[in-house]
């Protein structure tokens, strides 16, 4: 059965399984989450530092969850390589746009 998390661009069965193991069961569970903290928790759970690309996927996933009409460019995980999410200074990112 396909996970509801697989609707997130760039998230397949394996990444959805990681998200679920961290207690994220649906897209809305990502709203208000800190991608850096989710990445840290993933690394701790696995017992090693996961590739930084996983951090970029977390950033894209949280962005997707928080923006009903997302900028399509920002749905690519590689967009987030050199960009933090939420952008610095944006305190209430869950209410952005």
Which functions belong to the PLM regions below?
Residues 6, 17-25, 32-97:
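Structure-specific DNA junction-binding interface
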Residues 1-11:
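Sterile Alpha Motif
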